[in-house]
């Protein structure tokens, strides 16, 4: 009873501390380490019957990882369902499956194309060219790439036959481990020098296209030849590469080939590793452990996988990737490297890189003539079923695995002691970061979760790392002595990062190194994809009605000293407050000055297009006697290219200023009065309210408005006209007279009255005078 009571207390304490975990799969190291930290496991209930079905063999387990489980359990996956190698810390910490974003070759292929939006790096410098055969555009791009690669290979073969400057692994290719029987030699087929000329012209045209020399060209067939011409070109290429045909060339062609290859070296980052046999590796886009992978070197065979199969075309399952024909070999055997990294957060993106790794060897000597998977695939799930070739070097390990420390020692023996620290590790870190940057927006992440990934790299002869694929939930199986030690270490260090570091930011993180953490970005709340444009149509201006208007509040006056600081000099644009209304017993000119002084001081009024270009309309207001009636010409409100300046005057007119787009013969006149002649000079002494056209404005010499100032009397405000647009200039008159009967006026390069923009000419000088 005491034991049961203590167990109950222990569980209740773990529940309060949120230390409950569940494990799916075989993770004895994780279970042991969590129990040491006081966590309590919630056992999974395995129900019998049809409710729990094992996964189909054809379905992707790569979306859940390349889960090899244990080497002994790998063959018994049907009996023990392990769907996702996922362990759950009661919604606190989770291995997040992330929909297999990185495990899918399709996702990695497509995401890395967006790398230029994140960094100034070419994905082709660390990720072999990759295409989705199910997409029509990608299939066409792959066909053109295959053609161009064949043309480049012809140039390499010419140079190699002449100068032997492109060494290949002749010893490995002649190894007796090749499974393909040697064909009986016949009379060699001769290929004419015109074949080399076609390859040269295709490469030259490709270089000219990169230099944008094809902008004005209209060619139906891309890349120099027609599709039929390329088909014939490939047949002769196959004869040279695979059937031993003799490639004849002229001495002058050798130098051209060398020159063009040197130019291609600068624009094709993969020209060194791609070799000269045009081998591509075809992969199912959603499978792991090397299932369904094939190495092919004939275009027709690869296209047969998708041509005429609508299901494959729709699903886009097949991915074709350029095979690294010149990899770094260890004792004549191909190998790859498994590198772990940990993502603890996606916003901000936080990446931890594991310092230890291991390499996996193939069981067969390397050969480009033998395209069998046993030679070119280093997956342990494939190689464990094969026997080591008797032709392998005796220094290779029997279990086909090395630790990264043993690999570094081998590099020192090769005479490259700094290759690991200066080329390999920095290259792998950059490749991992770039792959995660491009996938960050497509991952359905959640807080308090993490994911451990396994990236596979192959190295070129120059030690350059090439990212092959990234697997979610990599295997933790202790298949060899190397993996037994390293896998236990990476699991223990993972818990140090995701659990211990939550309590102590300075705790030991083991072999994990923080290599990237971006600033946090606030994610806007998703409000749906509904787009809405609101507004109303612009109405056609109407003729001014004969009506009487009362005192109106003042229109917001937008002013600015020159240009800039629109928020400080345009309060009416950024706030709802209105400027004080001009009092009817005060001079309108004085009110304008006071409003102007409150905004920008006593300098010239001016506005800028930056603050006014969003304003909808312009309205000009004048003060007229309340009983005054107008007759309006029908075309008075139509914009004119050369507007005339209008002078309004009368016995009770306090602000004699306005600007209307009138012709020289158009004017306003009171009802019942005869219209004065267009060319007659207005008589300013007559106590009549009338409007007369003045001299046309010149953009270089703006003309002030001239009027008379009368005694103070009660006034009303009347609206003159509808929206007035496209004025070259506008002047505001200060009608306060001085002793010499002169008035001051303020010049504007543009004016906005009532909320709009009126483009203007040169501003007038403040303080200039004109006779009344």
From Swiss-Prot:
Q: Which reaction does it catalyse?
A: L-glutamyl-[protein] + glycine + ATP = glycyl-L-glutamyl-[protein] + ADP + phosphate + H(+)
Q: Which Pfam families match?
A: TTL
Q: Which residues bind L-glutamate?
A: 381
Q: What is its EC number?
A: 6.3.2.-
Which terms under GO biological process does the entry name?
axoneme assembly; cilium assembly; flagellated sperm motility; protein modification process; spermatogenesis
Reading the lineage from the top rank, the first entry is: Eukaryota
Q: What is this protein called?
A: Tubulin monoglycylase TTLL3
| Comment on protein domains | Two conserved structural elements specific among monoglycylases, IS1 and IS2, are involved in glycyl chains initiation. Two conserved structural interfaces likely constitute the binding platforms for tubulin tail and microtubule. Arg-289 is the main determinant for regioselectivity, which segregates between initiases and elongases in all tubulin--tyrosine ligase family. A glutamine residue at this position is found in elongases TTLL6, TTLL9, TTLL11, TTLL13, TTLL10 and favors glutamate-chain elongation, whereas an arginine residue is found in initiases TTLL2, TTLL4, TTLL5, TTLL3, TTLL8 and favors initiation.
| MF GO annotations | ATP binding; metal ion binding; protein-glycine ligase activity; protein-glycine ligase activity, initiating
Query: From which residue to which does any coiled coil extend?
Result: none
Q: What is the effect of changing residue 476 to I?
A: In a colorectal cancer sample; somatic mutation
Which residues are tagged with the site Essential for specifying initiation versus elongation step of the glycylase activity?
Answer: 289
What tissues has this protein been observed in? Expressed in brain, heart, kidney, testis, liver, lung, muscle, spleen, trachea and colon.
Q: Where does ATP bind?
A: 283, 289-290, 321-324, 334-336, 378-379, 469
Q: What are the TM regions of this chain, as residue ranges?
A: none
């Amino acid at each position: 009873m005491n034991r049961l009571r203590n167990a109950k207390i222990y569980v209740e304490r773990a529940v309060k501390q949120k230390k409950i975990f569940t494990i799916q799969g075989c993770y004895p190291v994780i279970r042991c380490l969590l129990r040491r930290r006081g966590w309590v496991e919630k056992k999974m209930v395995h129900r019998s019957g049809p409710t729990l079905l094992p996964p189909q063999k054809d379905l992707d387990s790569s979306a859940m990882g390349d889960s090899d489980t244990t080497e002994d359990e790998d063959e018994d996956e049907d009996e023990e369902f392990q769907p996702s190698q996922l362990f759950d810390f009661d919604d606190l910490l989770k291995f997040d499956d992330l929909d297999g974003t990185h495990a899918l070759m399709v996702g990695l292929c497509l995401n890395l194309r967006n790398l230029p939006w994140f960094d100034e790096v070419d994905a082709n410098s660390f990720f072999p060219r990759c295409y989705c055969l199910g997409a029509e555009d990608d299939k066409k791009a792959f066909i053109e790439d295959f053609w161009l690669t064949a043309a480049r290979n012809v140039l390499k073969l010419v140079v190699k036959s002449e100068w032997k400057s492109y060494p290949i692994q002749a010893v490995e290719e002649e190894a007796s481990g090749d499974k393909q029987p040697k064909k009986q030699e016949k009379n060699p087929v001769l290929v004419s020098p015109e074949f080399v000329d076609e390859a040269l012209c295709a490469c030259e045209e490709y270089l000219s296209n990169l230099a944008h020399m094809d902008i004005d060209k209209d060619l139906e067939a891309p890349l120099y030849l027609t599709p039929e011409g390329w088909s014939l070109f490939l047949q002769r290429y196959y004869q040279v590469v695979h059937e031993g045909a003799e490639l004849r060339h002229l001495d002058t062609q050798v130098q051209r080939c060398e020159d063009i290859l040197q130019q291609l070296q600068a624009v094709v980052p993969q020209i060194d590793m791609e070799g000269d046999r045009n081998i591509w590796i075809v992969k199912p886009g959603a499978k792991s452990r090397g299932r369904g992978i094939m190495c092919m070197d004939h275009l027709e065979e690869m296209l047969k996988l998708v041509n005429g199969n609508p299901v494959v075309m729709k699903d886009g399952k097949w991915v074709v990737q350029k095979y690294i024909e010149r990899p770094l070999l260890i004792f004549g055997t191909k190998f790859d490297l498994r590198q772990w990294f940990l993502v603890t957060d996606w916003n901000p993106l936080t990446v931890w890189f594991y310092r230890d790794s291991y390499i996996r060897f193939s069981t067969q000597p390397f050969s480009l003539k033998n395209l069998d998977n046993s030679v070119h695939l280093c997956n342990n799930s494939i190689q464990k079923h094969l026997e080591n070739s008797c032709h392998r070097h005796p220094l290779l390990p029997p279990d086909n695995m090395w630790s990264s420390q043993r690999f570094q020692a081998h590099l020192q023996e090769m005479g490259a002691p700094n290759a690991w620290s200066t080329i390999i590790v920095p290259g792998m870190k950059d490749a991992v970061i770039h792959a995660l940057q491009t996938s960050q927006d497509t991952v359905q992440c959640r807080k308090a979760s993490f994911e451990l990934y396994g990236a596979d790299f192959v190295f070129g002869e120059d030690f350059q790392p090439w990212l092959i694929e990234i697997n979610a939930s990599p295997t933790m199986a202790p298949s060899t002595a190397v993996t037994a030690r390293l896998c236990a270490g990476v699991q223990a260090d993972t818990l140090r990062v995701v659990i211990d570091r939550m309590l102590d930011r300075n705790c030991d993180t083991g072999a994990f190194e923080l290599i990237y953490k971006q600033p946090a970005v606030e994610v806007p709340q998703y409000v749906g994809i509904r787009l809405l444009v609101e507004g109303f149509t612009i109405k056609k201006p109407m003729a001014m009605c004969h009506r009487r208007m009362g005192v109106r509040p003042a229109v917001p006056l937008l002013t600015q000293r020159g240009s800039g600081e629109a928020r400080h000099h345009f309060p009416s644009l950024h706030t709802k407050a209105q400027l004080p209304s001009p009092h009817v017993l005060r001079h309108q000119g004085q009110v304008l000055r006071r409003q102007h002084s409150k905004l920008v001081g006593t300098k010239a009024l001016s506005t800028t297009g930056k603050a006014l270009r969003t304003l909808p309309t312009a309205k000009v207001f004048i003060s007229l006697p309340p009983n005054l009636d107008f007759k309006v010409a029908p075309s008075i409100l139509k914009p004119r290219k050369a507007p005339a300046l209008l002078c309004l005057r009368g016995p009770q007119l306090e602000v004699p200023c306005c600007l209307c787009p009138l012709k020289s013969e158009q004017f306003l006149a009171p009802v019942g009065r005869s219209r004065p002649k267009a060319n007659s000079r207005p008589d300013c002494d007559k106590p009549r309210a009338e409007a007369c056209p003045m001299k046309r404005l010149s953009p270089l010499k703006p003309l002030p408005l001239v009027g008379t100032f009368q005694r103070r009397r009660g006034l009303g405000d009347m609206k003159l006209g509808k929206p007035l647009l496209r004025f070259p200039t506008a002047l505001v008159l200060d009608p306060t007279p001085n002793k010499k009967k002169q008035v001051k006026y303020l010049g504007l390069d543009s004016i906005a009255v009532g909320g709009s923009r009126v483009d203007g000419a040169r501003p007038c000088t403040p303080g200039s005078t004109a006779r009344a």
